[in-house]
Amino acid sequence: MEEIGHHFGLGATAHGQHHSQLPWGSSPLSAVISPPPQQQQQHQQQSAGYLAHSPLSLNTAPPGVSHGGGSGCSNPVLQLANGSLLEACAKAAKEPSSSSYAADVEAIKAKIISHPHYSSLLAAYLDCQKVGAPPEVSARLTAVAQDLELRQRTALGGLGTATEPELDQFMEAYHEMLVKYREELTRPLQEAMEFLRRVETQLNSLSISGRSLRNILSTGSSEEDQEGSGGETELPEIDAHGVDQELKHHLLKKYSGYLSSLKQELSKKKKKGKLPKEARQQLLSWWEMHYKWPYPSESQKVALAESTGLDLKQINNWFINQRKRHWKPTDEMQFVMMDAYHPPNAAFYMDGHFVNDSGLYRFG
């Protein structure tokens, strides 16, 4: 009986009590999907003799087995296993050397394969295997199952499909068990997916209202490119596309101040570096022309700022640093600078000019 239980996923104790097993490697389907031997005429004759002399009945039980012993008897599959469908195989198991044992087992396999519900039973088994599998694996399983079923049915084309209520009930019960098993396997995955959706919803509620986290991540890079362009501090243009336009208005209204301050900081960092080459060249030219007195007036500073594209602060800082590093006033220049701070001599100091004994003198 243990060998028969191995083929049908059922184990038997020494006292005749059965318990359910579900190892898919040794399940009835794993035995069914293996190609049957080529001795089909012998199987058909033995199957016909088996049906004629051993009518199937769900209400009969093998000797020594009570329906009330053990909690496993409430399982419909176990109740079917206790019937005379497997009783003949159990009797044959007493003589392992007999050739009728293997023939009866193969005959039962052939009946299951040729049964009208075999397709749904095989599909239910594959559904259990597909739980959590990648799409490409599921597609391969389906293709292999279809090809295998076609070859098996072709090999058993001569076997008739007689009506057997007990076998029908067995197929339906096993199919129902596989469906329930698939539901148990699928439930944890469904709970995990529901948890992920709930977390995503919470993250979306914490972020911008009405905008999904995926949209924020997808559009974040383009907005950063616009901010890092280094041009004018104007806000990016808004495309008129319904809901997206409202979301962009909301974003600009909420973060415009932050973006403006960020752009100003970026522009300051750029200005702290070296001045453009052309601007430095113009400042050096003015420096060489006015080396004796490198103090540009306010109007000259404005003109230099316009021609170089710099601001007045940059112009002042450049001349201060240039004078500290590369200019040393002569004695006459020091005298002029000292007299410029005394009121009696203030009349002699003008914009880039001063008057000495020989008359009006201009530096540069």
UniProtKB/Swiss-Prot annotation:
According to the UniProt entry, its GO molecular function terms are: DNA binding; DNA-binding transcription factor activity, RNA polymerase II-specific
User: Superkingdom of the source?
Assistant: Eukaryota
Entry comment describing in which tissues the protein is expressed: The unit of inflorescence is the spikelet, which bears a fertile tract, the lemma, and the floret consisting of palea, two lodicules, three stamens and the pistil. The lemma is completed by the awn, an appendage homologous to the laminae of normal leaves. Expressed in the inflorescences and lemmas and at lower levels, in palea and vascular bundles.
DNA-binding residues: 267-330
The question of whether Transferase is a record keyword is answered with no
Pfam families cross-referenced by the UniProt entry: ELK, Homeobox_KN, KNOX1, KNOX2
- For the region Disordered, give the residue spans: 13-49
Compartments where found: Nucleus
The record lists the effect of Y118H as: In strain: cv. Bomi
Give the record's keywords alphabetically: DNA-binding, Homeobox, Nucleus
Matching entries from SUPFAM superfamilies are given as: Homeodomain-like
User: Polar residues compositional bias: what residue ranges?
Assistant: 19-29
Query: Mind telling me which Gene3D superfamilies this protein's record contains?
Result: Homeodomain-like (1.10.10.60)
Q: Where is the ELK domain?
A: 246-266
Q: What is its main location?
A: nucleus
Similarity remark: Belongs to the TALE/KNOX homeobox family.
How it assembles, according to the record, is: Binds DNA as a monomer.
Q: What is this protein called?
A: Homeobox protein KNOX3
Which gene does this sequence derive from?
A: KNOX3
